[in-house]
Amino acid sequence: MDRRPLTWALVLLGPALAIALGPAAAQEAPEKLCGHHFVRALVRLCGGPRWSSEEDGRPVAGGDRELLRWLEGQHLLHGLMASGDPVLVLAPQPLPQASRHHHHRRATAINPARHCCLSGCTRQDLLTLCPH
């Protein structure tokens, strides 16, 4: 039995299969991340003090509160409040009446947490939100 045709078929089809399957494996589907799931994914990806490595699978006590302290003053805090996660919601600061409409419109337009919750985010999207 002559194996030359089989060998040539593998030689010719091998690289074609590698090229065809390569980009599909590199692309990742966006994942919808809301509330504390968004924060945890961001911390795992970006890193953070103490609670970023949950190596044994157990969450660190008070982890959500520490996450909020880390995010204080960051552009993501408003996104967490807008996502409506009752565990993470802080009391919003009162705004003057005249600026409430503009603030809401601006927050909706540039709110990464809301975008990740509604449309989903890839790992690369989350990397752009890392502070360092």
UniProtKB/Swiss-Prot annotation:
Modified residues (Pyrrolidone carboxylic acid): 27
Keyword terms of this UniProt record: Cleavage on pair of basic residues, Disulfide bond, Hormone, Pyrrolidone carboxylic acid, Secreted, Signal
GO biological process: adenylate cyclase-inhibiting G protein-coupled receptor signaling pathway; positive regulation of epithelial cell migration; positive regulation of wound healing
Propeptide: 67-104
UniProt entry tagged with the keyword Cell membrane: no
UniProt xrefs under CDD domains: IlGF_relaxin_like
SMART domains to which the protein is assigned, alphabetical: IlGF
GO cellular component, as recorded: extracellular space
Cell location: Secreted
Entry's Gene Ontology molecular function annotations: hormone activity; protease binding
Residues in the signal sequence: 1-21
Role of this protein: Seems to play a role in testicular function. May be a trophic hormone with a role in testicular descent in fetal life. Is a ligand for LGR8 receptor.
Subunit relationships: Heterodimer of a B chain and an A chain linked by two disulfide bonds. 20% of B chains include an extra N-terminal pentapeptide.
Name recorded for this polypeptide: Insulin-like 3
